[in-house]
Structures are given as structure tokens and as C-alpha cells.
């Protein structure tokens, strides 16, 4: 009786788990998205997000064949980390053919996922959640897992920000300081893979890049300091995701596309606003500059 009265009086309270999940994904997406844009590995992130369908399909097939019940997110994370390490090795060893090899991993990963999914007896509703996102159905166990991964990503970023900063702007400088470029690059890609899986729960595989890239692109128009870009990106992610959830709930729209549209409108608006700094002001995506932290 009391719970129904509270739901009727404050309908948005039932969305509290959804807002918490969006908050965690927004923070991780804003922070890691900054490294991704500055390092110019957006295409790598896109290939991971789409090729991860292979890990999802394999996980669902194993669940069906062995009659197991476990969180599909774990299979997605294992697949994402494996793909990140493969792509990292490709980047470091075959840079001249990086684009073609990334496209190969992108398409092959999706093909493997589709093959495994086709072997399932019935269509699995969780697949739609991974493709298009369905944060409205987040469970307490989902929140715990997202919280753990969020703390893991942010903790490593706090400890290793200086190394990541040097890696993003000058790999040779990192090597000259007796730091393993391969180690730090792999770690950056692994954190990116974990963040991608977190964002998939909010936006889905198809629309995830809008939450990872567009807020950073907007922030780069108003600042060139990495920490400030991260802060602005996190705020934009929170604003767009919370607004998108409320709009989707009120208008009965899907949440992921609603958030993606808000991100796109925000980026379009930023293009129309006069830049606060002189056009000659260096941007963090320019590899030749020595940026402030």
C-alpha cells in the first residue's frame, strides 16, 4: 500500500536504479572518452563495440547448451578485453594496415555473434538490450557490477593519468622515460573495452559511440586542458542521459536513441556557438602541442 502510494506520488522514483546506472556510465564514458578522442582511437573503439557481438552471441549460446545462468555482461567483458588486446597488437605491429585490420575484426566479430545467435532455438530478448540498450530494466545485480567496474576504471585512471597523458600525445616520449609503450597502450585499451561494455547497457552497441565521443567533441570546443575536458564531458553525459531518461519515460520513447539525439543536438548547438577561445588555440587532439594537465 505504502509503496504504491509512493510510486503514484513520485513516479520518477521507480527510475532511481536507471539514474544510478546512467550516472556510473556517464562518469566512465566522459573520462575514457577524453583519452579515446585525444589518442585518435575512435575507430578502434567502434570496432570493439561492434565486434563484441561475437562474445555476446557465444555467451548466450553457452547458456543455452550448458543450461547455465550467469550475467551476460561477463562474457561481453571477456570478449571486449580479448578484442582490445588483439587490436592493440595490430596497432603496434602493423600500423600501415591498421584500418583494414580493424575493419576485419569489426566484421568478423559481428559475423561470429550472428552465427552463434542463429543457433539459439528462440530469439533472446537480452540481445535487443545489448544492441539498442535497455537501461530501464537494470537490476540490483547489474548496478553492483557496473559500480565495481566504474570504480576499477576511475581508480586506475587516477593512478595512471600522467602515463596515459604522455601516451596520448607522444609515444616516443613515453618510451624515452623508460616506460613500456605496449603495456600502457594495452592498459588504456582494456579500460576502454570495460567502459564500452558499461555504455552498452545505457546506449546499446549501435549507439554507444555517441555517449563516448560527442561530449568530448563538445568539450574540446571550449577548453584544451585534459582535466577540464573530462569534467565537462562527464557533466554533459550526465545532463543528456538524465534528460533522455525523463523524456523517454514521459513520451514512451526508447532511452538509447533519445539520449543519442540529445547528444547530437548538443554537438550541433556547439558548432553554432562562437568559440570562447581564439581559433589558433591548440586543441588536445593536435599531437604536436604540449598540453596542460
Swiss-Prot record:
Residues annotated as transmembrane: 12-32, 41-61, 68-88, 101-121, 140-160, 183-203, 253-273
Keyword Chaperone part of the UniProt annotation: no
Compartment(s) where it occurs, according to its Swiss-Prot or TrEMBL record: Cell inner membrane
Gene3D superfamilies: ABC transporter involved in vitamin B12 uptake, BtuC (1.10.3470.10)
GO biological process: response to zinc ion; transmembrane transport
Keywords on record: Cell inner membrane, Cell membrane, Membrane, Transmembrane, Transmembrane helix, Transport
The organism's place on the tree of life at top rank: Bacteria
Entry keyword Cell membrane: yes
One annotated Gene Ontology cellular component of this protein: ATP-binding cassette (ABC) transporter complex
Membrane topology (UniProt): Multi-pass membrane protein
A Pfam family per the record: ABC-3
Summary of the function given for this chain in its UniProt record: Part of an ATP-driven transport system CPn_0541/CPn_0542/CPn_0543 for a metal.
Family membership noted in the UniProt record: Belongs to the ABC-3 integral membrane protein family.
Protein name per the record: Probable metal transport system membrane protein CPn_0543/CP_0209/CPj0543/CpB0565
Amino acid at each position: 500500500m505504502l509503496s504504491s502510494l509512493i510510486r503514484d506520488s513520485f513516479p520518477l522514483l521507480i527510475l532511481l536504479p536507471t539514474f544510478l546506472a546512467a550516472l556510473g556510465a556517464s562518469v566512465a564514458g566522459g573520462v575514457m572518452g577524453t583519452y579515446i578522442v585525444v589518442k585518435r582511437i575512435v575507430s578502434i573503439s567502434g570496432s570493439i563495440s561492434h565486434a563484441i557481438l561475437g562474445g555476446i552471441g557465444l555467451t548466450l549460446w553457452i547458456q543455452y547448451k550448458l543450461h547455465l545462468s550467469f550475467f551476460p555482461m561477463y562474457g561481453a567483458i571477456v570478449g571486449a578485453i580479448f578484442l582490445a588486446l588483439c587490436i592493440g597488437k595490430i596497432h603496434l605491429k602493423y600500423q600501415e594496415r591498421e584500418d583494414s585490420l580493424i575493419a576485419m575484426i569489426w566484421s568478423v566479430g559481428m559475423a561470429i555473434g550472428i552465427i552463434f545467435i542463429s543457433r539459439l532455438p528462440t530469439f533472446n530478448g537480452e540481445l535487443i538490450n545489448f544492441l539498442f540498450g535497455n537501461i530501464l530494466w537494470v537490476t540490483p545485480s547489474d548496478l553492483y557490477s557496473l559500480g565495481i567496474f566504474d570504480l576499477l576504471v576511475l581508480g586506475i585512471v587516477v593512478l595512471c593519468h600522467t602515463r596515459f597523458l604522455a601516451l596520448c600525445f607522444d609515444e616516443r616520449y613515453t618510451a624515452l622515460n623508460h616506460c613500456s609503450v605496449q603495456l600502457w597502450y594495452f592498459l588504456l585499451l582494456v579500460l576502454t573495452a570495460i567502459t564500452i561494455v558499461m555504455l552498452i547497457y545505457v546506449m546499446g552497441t549501435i549507439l554507444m559511440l555517441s555517449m563516448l565521443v560527442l561530449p568530448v567533441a563538445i568539450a574540446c570546443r571550449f577548453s584544451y586542458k585534459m582535466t577540464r575536458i573530462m569534467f565537462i564531458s562527464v557533466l554533459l553525459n550526465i545532463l543528456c542521459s538524465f534528460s533522455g531518461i525523463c523524456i523517454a519515460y514521459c513520451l514512451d520513447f526508447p532511452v538509447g536513441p533519445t539520449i543519442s539525439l540529445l547528444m547530437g543536438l548538443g554537438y550541433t548547438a556547439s558548432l553554432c556557438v562562437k568559440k570562447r577561445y581564439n581559433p589558433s588555440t591548440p586543441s588536445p587532439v593536435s599531437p604536436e602541442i604540449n598540453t596542460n594537465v
